[in-house]
Amino acid sequence: MARRAAAVLLLLALGCLLGILLLCLGSGDARGPPSFKYGIVLDAGSSHTAVFIYKWPADKENDTGVVSEHSMCDVEGPGISSYSSKPPAAGKSLEHCLSQAMRDVPKEKHADTPLYLGATAGMRLLTIADPPSQTCLSAVMATLKSYPFDFGGAKILSGEEEGVFGWITANYLLENFIKRGWLGEWIQSKKKTLGAMDFGGASTQITFETSDAIEDPKNEVMLKLYGQPYKVYTHSFLCYGRDQVLKRLLSKVLQAENYQETVANPCWPTGYRKSLSLSSIYDSPCTEKERPGLPLNTTVVVSGTGNGNLCAVHVNKLFDFTSCSFSHCSFDGVFQPEVSGNFIAFSAFFYTVDFIRTVMERPVHSPSDLKDAAETICATSWNELYQKAPRLEKRLPDYCATSTFVYLLITKGYNFNNRSFPSIAFQKKAGETSIGWALGYMLNLTNMIPAQEPASHRSMLYNYWVILILLFVITTLTALLTAVYLLRRSKSSTI
C-alpha cells in the first residue's frame, strides 16, 4: 500500500516538475518592461497655465487604470487671456515648459505624442469682452505647432465641458468606473461615482451623478462609459472663480464706501493697506456693469479692518439666493437637484481649506468649522498672518474673503448641510496625479475611455506567475519528501 502511495506521489511530483518546466518555457516569450506612450495637455486657466504630461503602457491604450501623471510644469506669468494686448508674449510664455516636455518625453516618442490645449473661463471672459479676439489663441497655436509633437488643436472649453471632464478625471483615477480584478481582468467597479467641485480663477463648477429629474436640459449630460450609462448634473458659474470674486467683492466694498479716496475693507486683515486703481477692478466683464462714472485711472487707498461679519454681508451680495423658477435652485436662478453621495473638491477649494488646516491649524469637519475658521482668519491681523505664512504673502490678504466665500458657496449655494458636508474630500491629487479637467479632456480626445465595456480577458501578471511557480515548487518538494518517507517506511517494514 505504501509503495502504491509513493508511486502516486512520484507521479504528482513529475507532473509539478513538468508544470514548472512549461511555465519557464512560456516565460521565454514574455516581453520585457512595456514601452510607454505619452500625451500632453496645456491647462490654460484664467490665472495661469499648467502643462501636464501623462503616460501609459503602449499595450494598454484602450484599457483604464493605467494612465498616470508623468510630470507637470507651471508656466511663469499670468494666464494666456492676460496677453490680449500683446499676443506674441502668450506663445513665448510657454517655451520654458514646452522645453521641459521635450526632455521629459523620450525623443523617439515626440512625433507620436498628442499635444492639446484647452482654455477655460479666462478665455471665455475674453471672448465676451472682445468677441472677435482670437489673436492670443492664434499666437499660442503657432508656438505649439513649432514643436515636434502631434498637435491636436486648441479649444476654448465650455463651462459644462470643464465640469464633466473634471468629474471624469476624479472618478477615473479613483477606479469608480472600472477596475482590475484579482486575475488581471477588467471588471465593473461596484463603487458609486463621486461628485466633483472645481473652484478656478474665473469660474466654479459642480458636477455629480443623480437619479433625480434634471429640470433644466442645459444642466444634463448623458454619458456612456465602459457600457454603463451615467446621468450627470453639471453647471459652471462664470465670474464665480476666485480672482473674479475678489474683483467683484472690491466693487461691492467701494460702492458701500461711495468710492471715497480711502476705503475700509472688512475682508482684509487689520494693518493691511494697498493703493488700487479703478482699472484693476473694473477691467473685467464680471464687474463692468458696476463701473462708476469716475475715470478708471482714479486711485483709491484700501485699508483692512478685519470684520468677519461685515465681510460676510458683502460676500452674500455676490449671490442671488431668491430668484428661482424651478423646484430647487442653487443661486442666480440655476436649477440644482439635491446633492447626494461623496464629493471631491479641488483647485482653490483645496488651497483654501488646506490653509485653514495647516496655517491656521483648525479642523474642517462641518459647516460650523468652516464658518468659525473664516471668522478667525478675518479677525487675525496682517502682522500675525504674515508671521504664520510669509511665503504666501501675495495671497495672504484674501484668505478672509476666500474662506467666507467658500463657506457661503458650499452651504447656501450648493446646499450642503451638517449631514452632507462631511462627504466632501478636499484634495489636490488622487495618488500622484493632479485632479482637474486636463486628464479627462485627454482621455476623451484620445478615445481612451470606450463607450462599451472592454472584453473580458485575463493576463498572467508577473506576481501571479511567481506565486504559481512557488506553489509548484512547494507541492513538488512535499510530494518527493513524502514519497521518500513512504518508500523507506515500506522497506523497513519488509525487513
Swiss-Prot record:
The UniProt record lists the keyword ATP-binding: yes
Where are the disulfide bridges? C73-C97, C239-C286, C267-C311, C324-C329, C378-C400
The residues annotated as the active site are E162 (proton acceptor)
**Listed cofactors:** Ca(2+); Mg(2+)
Location within or outside the cell = Membrane
Q: Which residues take part in binding ATP?
A: G201, A202, S203, T204, Q205
CDD domains to which the protein is assigned, alphabetical? ASKHA_NBD_NTPDase2
Q: What is its EC number?
A: 3.6.1.-
Keywords per UniProt: ATP-binding, Calcium, Disulfide bond, Glycoprotein, Hydrolase, Magnesium, Membrane, Nucleotide-binding, Transmembrane, Transmembrane helix
Q: Which residues lie on this side of the membrane: Extracellular?
A: 26-465
Q: Residues on the Cytoplasmic side? A: 2-4, 487-495
User: Membrane-spanning regions, if any?
Assistant: 5-25, 466-486
Q: What Gene Ontology terms describe what this protein does at the molecular function level?
A: ATP binding; GDP phosphatase activity; ribonucleoside triphosphate phosphatase activity; UDP phosphatase activity
Per the record, membrane topology reads: Multi-pass membrane protein
The GO cellular component terms are: membrane; plasma membrane
Name the Gene Ontology biological process terms.
Answer: nucleoside diphosphate catabolic process
- Report the superkingdom from the record: Eukaryota
Gene3D superfamilies per record: 3.30.420.40, Exopolyphosphatase. Domain 2
Give the signal peptide as a residue range, or say none if absent.
none
Tell me which residues are glycosylated: N62, N297, N418, N444
Q: Which family does it belong to?
A: Belongs to the GDA1/CD39 NTPase family.
Biological role stated in the UniProt entry: In the nervous system, could hydrolyze ATP and other nucleotides to regulate purinergic neurotransmission. Hydrolyzes ADP only to a marginal extent.
Name the record gives this protein: Ectonucleoside triphosphate diphosphohydrolase 2
| Species name | Gallus gallus
The gene coding this protein: ENTPD2
